[in-house]
Amino acid sequence: MKTRMIIVAAPSGAGKSSFVERITREDSRLVDIVTFTTRSIRQGETPGLQYNFIDHADFEQKIKEGFFVEWAKVHTNFYGTSYSSLETAWNQGKTAIMDIDIQGVATFKSKFPDAKTVFIHPPSIDELRRRIEKRDGKVPADIEVRMANAEKEIREASKFDYQIVNDVFEKSYGEFKKIVEDLLA
């Protein structure tokens, strides 16, 4: 039986969004679940494509309304996944795939034990730092928070069903694609 939910997690800057965005373009059996966030939009992002961007007050109201399957405060912003986005994917007969933070993975696994999880490792902590520093608008304090969180997240990787090191993107993506294809068979 094919998997109904694939969860991809990684430290910020390890490549999880790139993997998920590409595989959903290439495989029509998948729907990328777009999460909600209170963080600022980055250059090149389109609202509703990478994230649904909302302010803190709206996010907190949605929490009270029970709108989210899971939500978490990551770094200094909120992120959450709506029930309706999953229901829409499943009603279309598709597998939901999403990139979320480590906190969200535990919540999803408690509610959906059959969900499959993939952890994307950076090639090294130094390379991860370089990738994060290269992003627009990162202040040193934010970089340090992300690096501290990354070390904690990497320690959780053994709890995942699959692990990939994103050292050479095409090779790593090929490994990821094979895992997803096997889960959809």
UniProtKB/Swiss-Prot annotation:
CDD domains: GMPK
InterPro entries named among the record's database cross-references: GK/Ca_channel_bsu (IPR008145), Guanylate_kin-like_dom (IPR008144), Guanylate_kinase (IPR017665), Guanylate_kinase_CS (IPR020590), P-loop_NTPase (IPR027417)
Enzyme Commission identifier(s): 2.7.4.8
Subcellular location: Cytoplasm
Keyword annotations: ATP-binding, Cytoplasm, Kinase, Nucleotide-binding, Transferase
Keyword ATP-binding: yes
MF-aspect GO terms: ATP binding; guanylate kinase activity
GO cellular component: cytosol
Residues noted as binding ATP in the record, renumbered to the chain: 10-17
One Pfam family matching this protein: Guanylate_kin
Guanylate kinase-like domain segment(s): 3-181
Family: Belongs to the guanylate kinase family.
HAMAP family, A to Z: Guanylate_kinase
Name of this protein: Guanylate kinase
Organism this protein belongs to: Bdellovibrio bacteriovorus (strain ATCC 15356 / DSM 50701 / NCIMB 9529 / HD100)
Upper lineage: Bacteria, Pseudomonadati, Bdellovibrionota, Bdellovibrionia, Bdellovibrionales
